[in-house]
Amino acid sequence: MFQKKLKQQQIVVKQSLPITPHELVYDNLSLLTAGLDEVGRGCLAGPVVAGAVILPDTISIDGLADSKTISSNRRYILAKKIYETAISWGIGVVWPKEIDEINILQASLKAMAHAATVLKTFPELLLIDGNKAIPQKFFIQFGWNFLPIQHSIIKGDASIPAISAASIIAKTFRDTLMSKLDKRYPQYNFSKNKGYGSKTHREILQKIGPSPIHRMTFKGVTSH
């Protein structure tokens, strides 16, 4: 009966949900919940990266918040605590070539599906930052035929600990990756701009053009 309720069910809401810190009560059942978020959506270069985190009910992590509001040093400290504390965590990555092929919205949703499907523990409920549900096709691509319930929450990364945690591990993973890519493409200063469209980054694009990891369909890249 419980599995029948969950199978292929997707729910999208655009307002705050009646949730406890780490779980949502649905039909009087306490569901194992994963928070999902993505980072790098607005970048001109590099992948979009998503995080998925299942936190325990018995342990809280002080300082969880939207990764954009936390200093870089603090993010890495929190990421370490998340890795140590989480029941399970996952990272999903979609690279620029595919971003250009399917568009950044679809790539962001696919990255979140990827992050969810690599969790070692199957989540019964996904709490997703934003206002979109993840299409079934992406879960199927990563081998899931049994789908969790989904709730999308606007600004969930600022209010839901599991989503905040997902945001933090995605951000630190991506920042570390961009610093590594800086060694391959040092002329673009990815270790500093992380692929975002800073003034200096745009000036570099104007002078030497894009690298193989730039998003060719993005206006900030193709306009140069």
From Swiss-Prot:
Keywords: Cytoplasm, Endonuclease, Hydrolase, Manganese, Metal-binding, Nuclease. One of its GO terms (biological process) is DNA replication, removal of RNA primer. It catalyses: Endonucleolytic cleavage to 5'-phosphomonoester. The gene is rnhB. SUPFAM superfamilies: Ribonuclease H-like (SSF53098). InterPro entries: RNase_HII, RNase_HII/HIII, RNase_HII/HIII_dom, RNaseH-like_sf, RNaseH_sf. Endonuclease that specifically degrades the RNA of RNA-DNA hybrids. This is Ribonuclease HII. PANTHER family: RIBONUCLEASE H2 SUBUNIT A (PTHR10954), RIBONUCLEASE HII (PTHR10954:SF18). Its EC number is 3.1.26.4.
